[in-house]
Amino acid sequence: MITMGPMQAMEVLKEAVYMGAESGVLVSDRCFAGADVCATSYTLCQGIQKAGTFDVILCGKQTTDGDTAQVGPEIAEFMGIPHGANVMDITDIGENEITIRMNLEHRIQTQRMKMPCLLTVEKDANTPRLPSYKRKLNMSLDCLKTVSLKELSDQDSKHYGLDGSPTQVERIFPPEKKKDKEIVEENGQKLARYLIHILQEKKFL
């Protein structure tokens, strides 16, 4: 299990280990702060490469804050490996390839891809086990470690955090609520003519 964030994020890794993960890696450094999607993906890519070899990387589909669903695919692009998004389940694992089912909204697609690869999974793809109290009591914190900038292969701080981010968020705000609703009780051609008139008035047509 690997995540990126401040030291408080170590609690997330502990929870994952209580649920059955073998180990956890926290990629954390002051210079990682302020990272956009691109810089976050690059940082995680560096952290994964530091962690060792792999067959499949599993990522959540999207975060609950930025909600972009871009980090997983961008990690794969930085690593030069194939990736599948919105994965519902894994139907078969071969020696060098994996078969997955993806939710493409209007259809379900079955796809086979070479390993190593990266998959972003739907939240309902499985039912996570509950944290084990016994595992919590017996767990050694030796399975958790932190990786900082000086331990990555690319140690140029300009490639991380705010300096390495091609985009910056100016502000976050809820959409404006508008109350100028209009109920139209026409039907047929009268309704169609009225809608065309409104669209022309607003210069959509």
Language-model features: where?
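N-terminal glycine-rich FAD/FM-binding segment characteristic of electron-transfer flavoproteins
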Residues: 1-205
